[in-house]
Amino acid sequence: MTAESMMFNGAVILMVLVLFGLAWGFLILKIQGGEAE
């Protein structure tokens, strides 16, 4: 496993985690907002 492939895998994992975190946070905000109303 070369350093380039490790960097590429790390970038892919990082992007997936960021997208998952944004979706999760948006879902929680939506649920909390619905309960508040």
Curated annotation (Swiss-Prot):
GO biological process: photosynthesis
Lineage of producing organism: Bacteria, Bacillati, Cyanobacteriota, Cyanophyceae, Oscillatoriophycideae
Keywords of the record: Electron transport, Membrane, Photosynthesis, Thylakoid, Transmembrane, Transmembrane helix, Transport
Keyword Transmembrane listed: yes
Function of the molecule: Component of the cytochrome b6-f complex, which mediates electron transfer between photosystem II (PSII) and photosystem I (PSI), cyclic electron flow around PSI, and state transitions.
Bilayer topology term: Single-pass membrane protein
Keyword match Electron transport: yes
Organism the protein comes from: Crocosphaera subtropica (strain ATCC 51142 / BH68) (Cyanothece sp. (strain ATCC 51142))
Segments traversing the membrane: 11-29
Family: Belongs to the PetM family.
Molecular function GO labels: electron transfer activity
Top-level taxon: Bacteria
Assembly and interaction partners: The 4 large subunits of the cytochrome b6-f complex are cytochrome b6, subunit IV (17 kDa polypeptide, PetD), cytochrome f and the Rieske protein, while the 4 small subunits are PetG, PetL, PetM and PetN. The complex functions as a dimer.
Compartments where found: Cellular thylakoid membrane
Pfam families to which the protein is assigned, alphabetical: PetM (PF08041)
Any one cellular-component term (Gene Ontology): plasma membrane-derived thylakoid membrane
Protein name, as recorded: Cytochrome b6-f complex subunit 7
